[in-house]
Structure formats: structure tokens, C-alpha cells
């Protein structure tokens, strides 16, 4: 995902400047989010913020856009302790954090920088399929972002 950090930053800054969002908050993670998110793309521990804090301090009405390729080792997504950060043990599986976020923020989508043709490619993209069961997934393109925003605005007056 590091290859897409600059693209994501430019894309969301442009959206923010176009007044698409009243309040834009950006958090980062590597592969999957667990009990910590980060306020800088390098995902250093000095830039961490508790995922629980985010869940409890942002209103449920927030629109959430998750950006990631959704590819990782299945253990990273499905097992407690699956994080690749050997200095930190996650007690809750990544999929459980994903479900918790989706339950808290019902208007949530996932933008994926991988070409859509690769989403159903083979067993190595199994994690994409699992995440797609939780979030509507769109390509990380201008058209994908437009479709994602349309999805987020469903049900608005």
C-alpha cells in the first residue's frame, strides 16, 4: 500500500477541497486494522491512536472510507495474534475489528487500488472476498470514488 499513499493523499485532499466532506479525518493501518490506527502513513508507534478511541469518539453518522488492497495472509485477517507487527500482539482478529467498525459506522465503503480483475483472481485474494462481504468495495479511481460517495450518501434527504 505504500505505493498508493501519495495518490490517496492527493485524492482525499481534492475531495476535501471540493467540500465533499464537512470533517475529514485520516487514519492509516498496515494490511488490516487492529487495536491501533495511525495518524501518519508511516504507521509508527509514536503516531498511534487507539481504534477504540476512534470508535467511541466519532459519531456513528460519520461516513467511512477504508482504503487498502485487502490482500494479506489469511491469519492476519482471521486469527487473533495474526498481526505482522512482532512487537505487538493483537488479541482480536482483524475481521472482528472490521465488523466492529462496520457496525458502528453503517455508511462505510472500501476503496481498493488493485485492478478489479484481480479481486477474484485466485486463492491469494481470498481476503478480498472476505472483506467484500462486510463492505461495498470500489476501485481506487475517480469513478470508483464517485461511486463510493454515492453509496455513502444513500438514504440522505
Question: What function would you assign to each model-found segment?
Answer:
Residues 60, 70, 74-157:
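Von Willebrand factor type A / integrin I
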Residues 4-9, 35-40, 75-79, 119-124:
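A short acidic (Asp/Glu
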Residues 19-24, 104-107:
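A generic structural motif
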Residues 12, 16, 54, 94-99:
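Short amphipathic alpha-helical segments and helix-helix/interface helices
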Residues 2-3, 54, 138-143:
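Short, basic, helix/turn surface patches
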Residues 1-21:
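An amphipathic, basic-hydrophobic helix/alpha-beta surface used to engage anionic
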Residues 23-65, 71-77, 95:
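Von Willebrand factor
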Residues 17, 41-43, 87, 130:
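A generic membrane alpha-helix/interface feature
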Amino acid at each position: 500500500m505504500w505505493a498508493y499513499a501519495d495518490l490517496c493523499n492527493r485524492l482525499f485532499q481534492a475531495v476535501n477541497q471540493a467540500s465533499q466532506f464537512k470533517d475529514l479525518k485520516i487514519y492509516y493501518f498496515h494490511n488490516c486494522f487492529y487495536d491501533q490506527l495511525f495518524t501518519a502513513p508511516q504507521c509508527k508507534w509514536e503516531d498511534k491512536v487507539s481504534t477504540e478511541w476512534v470508535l467511541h469518539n466519532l459519531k456513528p453518522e460519520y461516513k467511512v472510507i477504508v482504503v487498502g488492497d485487502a490482500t494479506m495472509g489469511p491469519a492476519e485477517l482471521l486469527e487473533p495474534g495474526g498481526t505482522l507487527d512482532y512487537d505487538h500482539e493483537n488479541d482480536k482478529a482483524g475481521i472482528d475489528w472490521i465488523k466492529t467498525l462496520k457496525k458502528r459506522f453503517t455508511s462505510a465503503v472500501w476503496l481498493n487500488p488493485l485492478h478489479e480483475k484481480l479481486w477474484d483472481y485466485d486463492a491469494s485474494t481470498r481476503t478480498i472476498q472476505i472483506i467484500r462481504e462486510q463492505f461495498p468495495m470500489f476501485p481506487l479511481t475517480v469513478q470508483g470514488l464517485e461511486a463510493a460517495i454515492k453509496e455513502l450518501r444513500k438514504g440522505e434527504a
